[in-house]
Structure formats: structure tokens, C-alpha cells
Amino acid sequence: MMAKPKKTIPAKLSDERIVIYDKDGISRLNEKRYGELHENFLSLSYVEALYLVAKDWVLIRDKKNKILSFEELHEIAHVIDKKLCIRYLVYKDLRNRGYTVRTGLKYGSDFRLYERSNIDEVHSKYLVKVFSEEIPCEISEITGFVRVAHSVRKELVIAIVDADGSVVYYNMGYLKL
């Protein structure tokens, strides 16, 4: 006999994030390391929300109470974040591989990445910076990311998304000779 699927978690579109007030939904998502927990709600980034909508875990309503499809949410989010497409592909790939992925904004990166084996870790091991194969990047820019990652005792992972949406990861750092 198949287990009864859990109910879809209701969420609301806020100005620059998705907000969940449903206590059961907050508990379920927080347990799986999604979102940022606040006193009486859980907030999701657009990338997290897109991932959860694609999996039918959340149902997002806009300010007029209209249910947003994946495509509609993507369109709204893309206005705010021009790198949304490639960030989403990397987020989805890492989550599907079993990693816990959090925003890396305060480190100047796209994501913080936690080891799969220890999701209760307080500190992430990696910072992930996302690039498109189609847009050139200066080596000085990458050097700056390596320097920041090193200064906060994290390893830098460069995620490059190609035209087909495939992701390749490179570990960047200092080499002591």
C-alpha cells in the first residue's frame, strides 16, 4: 500500500521572497533545511521556491490570491535576478545530489554548500559561485572569490552552466608548493 502524500504547503508571494506561515509546512521545510526561519514564518528565496514548486511541495499565491505556476513565478523572479536561470539549474542539481544549499550572499557568492553527510553542521564547507559558459569572466574576479573563500575558511566551487543547462563544478583554491 502506498503512503498518503503530504499536503502541499501554502505560501504567499511577498516583495522579494516567498513566505510560509503554515506551522506544519514551516516544520517540514525547516527539517529538510529549506528557507530561513523567522519568529512566526519561514521565508524562501526565489530559487528555493522554484525548486519546491517544481516538486509540488509548495503552492504559491500572489497578492491577489492567484496561484502561481512555475513559469509565472520564474517570470516574476527573473525581473529581480537576471542570473536566476543558471542559479536555479545549479541549485536544483546540488539539491538533487543530496546537498543542503543556502544563500551565499553575505560571502559574495551564490550559495553556501553543506556536506551531505552532516546536515546539522553549523558552518558550510563550500562557497559556490555560478557562471554561464556563454559569459566571459575575468580571472581577477575569480581570484577575488578565492580570496574571500579562503579568508572565511571555506573552499570555493565554481559552477559553470553550459548552453544545454548541464553543470560542471570546479574546486578553486590556493596551492601550497
Curated annotation (Swiss-Prot):
Pfam families for the chain: tRNA_int_endo, tRNA_int_endo_N
A single GO molecular function term of this UniProt record: tRNA-intron endonuclease activity
Active site annotation, chain numbering: 114, 123, 154
Coiled coil spans: none
Keywords from the UniProt entry: Lyase, tRNA processing
GO biological process terms, semicolon-separated: tRNA splicing, via endonucleolytic cleavage and ligation
Keyword Lyase applies: yes
Reactions catalysed according to its record: pretRNA = a 3'-half-tRNA molecule with a 5'-OH end + a 5'-half-tRNA molecule with a 2',3'-cyclic phosphate end + an intron with a 2',3'-cyclic phosphate and a 5'-hydroxyl terminus
TM stretches of this protein: none
UniProt-listed Enzyme Commission number(s): 4.6.1.16
SUPFAM superfamilies according to UniProt: tRNA-intron endonuclease catalytic domain-like, tRNA-intron endonuclease N-terminal domain-like
Any one annotated GO CC term: cytoplasm
InterPro entries: tRNA_endonuc-like_dom_sf (IPR011856), tRNA_intron_Endo_cat-like_sf (IPR036167), tRNA_intron_Endonuc_cat-like (IPR006677), tRNA_intron_Endonuc_N (IPR006678), tRNA_intron_Endonuc_N_sf (IPR036740), tRNA_splic (IPR006676), tRNA_splic_arch_short (IPR016442)
Family affiliation: Belongs to the tRNA-intron endonuclease family. Archaeal short subfamily.
Summary of the function given for this chain in its UniProt record: Endonuclease that removes tRNA introns. Cleaves pre-tRNA at the 5'- and 3'-splice sites to release the intron. The products are an intron and two tRNA half-molecules bearing 2',3' cyclic phosphate and 5'-OH termini. Recognizes a pseudosymmetric substrate in which 2 bulged loops of 3 bases are separated by a stem of 4 bp.
Binding partners and assembly: Homotetramer; although the tetramer contains four active sites, only two participate in the cleavage. Therefore, it should be considered as a dimer of dimers.
NCBIfam families, per database record: endA
Protein name: tRNA-splicing endonuclease
Organism: Methanococcus vannielii (strain ATCC 35089 / DSM 1224 / JCM 13029 / OCM 148 / SB)
Lineage of producing organism: Archaea, Methanobacteriati, Methanobacteriota, Methanomada group, Methanococci
Primary gene name: endA
